[in-house]
Amino acid sequence: MTHYCGINRMKEGTDFEKKHTPFIECKDRVKANDYFEVKISTGIPHPMEDNHFIHWIELYMGDLYLARVDFTQFMKPEVKLMVKAPSKEHEKFILRALMRCNLHGVWEYEKEILLE
């Protein structure tokens, strides 16, 4: 049963929040239409037990769905994806990651990327 409703975001930087926030690691600047690596993981390792684990991670470019990776308690909630940057018609874009803990709900993190 999930005890948290809606989408949660890190506010105070507590260990609890860091265990549930899907941090995005990638370049701050990328070339338009080029592929670049995006790593998504928790800031602090999250328990992966039968009754408490990260269920999935989703990645979006703004509101555009890119990918979803599902996990079981036998996996590390971390993923690396190759993402294609948008065309140069924009100066920047937002990557948005969502992560769901089976007990503590959905957590979100955003990162702004500049286009070269």
From Swiss-Prot:
CDD domains: SORL_classII
DNA repair keyword on record: no
Native source organism of the sequence: Methanocaldococcus jannaschii (strain ATCC 43067 / DSM 2661 / JAL-1 / JCM 10045 / NBRC 100440) (Methanococcus jannaschii)
PANTHER family given in the database record: SUPEROXIDE REDUCTASE-RELATED
Family of the protein in this entry: Belongs to the desulfoferrodoxin family.
Cofactor: Fe cation
Residues the entry annotates as binding Fe cation: H20, H46, H52, C101, H104
Protein name: Putative superoxide reductase
EC annotation from Swiss-Prot or TrEMBL: 1.15.1.2
Catalyzed reactions per annotation: reduced [rubredoxin] + superoxide + 2 H(+) = oxidized [rubredoxin] + H2O2
Keyword terms, alphabetized: Electron transport, Iron, Metal-binding, Oxidoreductase, Transport
InterPro entries linked: Desulfoferrodoxin_Fe-bd_dom (IPR002742), Desulfoferrodoxin_Fe-bd_dom_sf (IPR036073), Desulfoferrodoxin_SOR (IPR051233)
GO-annotated molecular function: iron ion binding; superoxide reductase activity
Keyword Cell wall biogenesis/degradation: no
Task of the protein: Uses electrons from reduced NADP, by way of rubredoxin and an oxidoreductase, to catalyze the reduction of superoxide to hydrogen peroxide.
Enzyme class: oxidoreductase
Cited Pfam families: Desulfoferrodox (PF01880)
Disulfide bonds: none
